[in-house]
């Protein structure tokens, strides 16, 4: 079985499923998509750790272009453990938090939560898996976007203001 693509699954799958949650707008279906994304990410990162027992590093060059020219994902022992850790935490959060989500958010906004959660997770996984600084910055921005949305979804009227304040602070820090 060809498993060269394993390093990209925890990044690409949540990133690909996030727009579906936004388009479908069904809370239960979005929850199911999120559980599937987190479960597959957790399983693939576990198998990646298994492959790392025989290798020092797993790499995946996008489009066949090597690292200095193209985009390359690289998983070594440390970021393999980190990827498995955040995938496991993401799966646990998805399974456990869904019960209390109805008290924290209006039902009509649940799909926003799952979209933002998937974006945040994909950004974190991308920062861990990427092998170049440019894509690390891109994934930090994706994760930040998801985090701003999660903060803005709060019931409190100050949530939107807090999200905007966090965004401005982050922009100043990046600059």
Residue ranges and their predicted role:
Residues 15-21, 64-70, 120-134:
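Membrane-embedded alpha-helical segments in integral membrane proteins
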Residues 11, 73-74, 87, 120, ...:
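Short conserved micro-motifs on helix faces and helix-strand junctions that flank
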Residues 171-175:
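Short "domain-exit" segments at the C-terminal end of structured domains
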Residues 1-6, 20-115:
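Transmembrane helix-loop-helix hairpins at membrane boundaries of multipass inner-membrane proteins
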Residues 13, 37-40, 89, 140-144:
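Transmembrane alpha-helical core residues of multi-pass small-molecule transporters
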Residues 5-17:
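The first (N-terminal) embedded transmembrane alpha-helix
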Residues 16, 20, 96-100, 142-151:
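Juxtamembrane interface elements at the cytosolic ends of transmembrane helices
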Residues 112-119, 123-170:
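Alpha-helical multi-pass transmembrane bundles of energy-transducing inner-membrane proteins
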